[in-house]
Every structure is written in structure tokens, then in C-alpha cells.
Amino acid sequence: MLQVADQMCGSHGFLEAAHEYMKPEKCTRRIAEYMDLEKTAVGLYWYEPLYIPGLLQTEEYVCELLNRGLPPLSDETVEERIAFRLQRRELLNGADALYAFVIYEAALRAVVGGAEVMKRQLDRLLEVQRLRNVCVQILPVDRAPYCALAGPVVVIETAEHETYAYMTGQGTSVLQSDPSDVSRQRRAFGVVRGQALSVQDSDEFIRQVAKEL
């Protein structure tokens, strides 16, 4: 298409050469800012109500989400984003950062990719739970405070003792640095985490959900 347009416009190859720059970005500028913070965080506190948190997703789970997303993505873009997300998982192996995840029960009950894919995803949660710097807790639907219904939030603490809050929605994302805004999100995470099951009870809850699939 670009080659034809180049010939019609007499651009002498300039339009065709722009092909690489017209590919969809792996992430927006705001997401890129969050990723930079994520890589250097000393503490990351993540609440997720609808999906398994990105750092905990299996390749199958990621693939299913991207392949069925709207608007549809090209195969090349899907492959790039899968590789990008899987690369992020390596952060969990760093001993210098603490990761605390609270996952709403609905995210475990939503069967993404079929029962077998979801079972392996739940096994992945139990696997990362064994890492000494990772904590995964489940928030049952009958214990959810109202703030748990407001959407996902990630609170990030940096080595410079700065704190940020990152929130996402349908095609939108917000990175907050204002102390009052961040404080509000930290308190919301604290309330949600306070209502979540203990780590031991969360493990048992995950196993029970897997048995029911």
C-alpha cells in the first residue's frame, strides 16, 4: 500500500521508508513512564479486580487476552506485546523489590482461554507465591469493600522514597504523583488488602477455584 502511494505521490521512497514508524507502539508514553517506574521500584502494591495482574500472567493467558482484544491487532503486534509482557515478569526474580498483589475473586472466576489455560494460570499464582519477595492475596466477593469496585490500582514506591499511583480503564491510564492523590490510592489499597484473605488462605482459595474448573 505504501509502495503504491509512494509511486502516486512521487515521494521517491520516503513514504515506503516510513513503514517502520507507522507500526502500532508497544505502549503509550504514559504507560512507558509507568514501566520505567516499575523496573526501578523497591515496592509495588497492585490491586486488580477483573484480570490476573500483568506480572503474574502466563503466556497462554496473555495470548488469549491480546488475540481477543478490541480493536483487533496484527499478528506481529500481538507477538511483540506478548514478548514485552513476558519480559516484564523477570522483575519478580529481583531480590531488591517487594511485590504485593491483591486479586478480586472475579478475576479468578473469569475463565480466559478455557478451563485448562485457566488452571495453568492459577498454578502460576501458587508458583510465584513461593518467591520470598512476592505476596498474593485473594479478595472474596463477600468481603469486598466499596473501593474495591472502583477499578485497578498500582502503588509504586521508588528507591528515592517517592510514591506514585497508576490506574487503568477502558483505553485510558493515569499516573498520579500528587501526594494527596497518591495517599488516597494507598489508603484504598490498604483497605482492600485488609479485607483480603491471608496468604495461606489465599493459596487454599486458589486451589479450590482450580478444582471447580
Q: Where do the PLM segments sit?
A:
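Interdomain hinge/linker segments and adjacent boundary elements that couple functional modules
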Residues: 1-110, 177, 191-213
